[in-house]
Amino acid sequence: MALRHSVIHINNRGGSVGYRSDVAFACTEEVHEIVIAAAEMNKEFKEFLMADDLWRGVNDEIPSNVLKSGTEGRYFWQSIKYYDGFPACEALNGIMGFLDDLGRDAEYGFIKLGEEMDDNELLGEPGAFDLYINRSIEV
């Protein structure tokens, strides 16, 4: 029987703050217009998009286009709680599901990289948007 290790973050009061993931989403200009329209109708979704690490300048090599009309969408969040049932997550999941139902899954890419080594979720066509998983150890 193999032992599995889980990572659970503990806050400064001793309570668990939950399972965290890195999440990337990219899409065509046309799909980005749908994302922007959805954000205008859903406050939690808009706040989620505005919390994108590219917009906050975490990686200055990649210009942010958060909620900018006329551009492809490219979003990245580090160490976030991405759970089913959270309104913002459900909004993005709903958009991706809608695109899948229309057979337009090639117009977006999504990667969720969890804390567990085997917790990887890829939807749409991430490679078409230069989204890839790269786990490494730096010494």
Q: What residue ranges belong to the model's regions?
A:
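Charged interaction segments
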Residues: 38, 42-43, 48-139
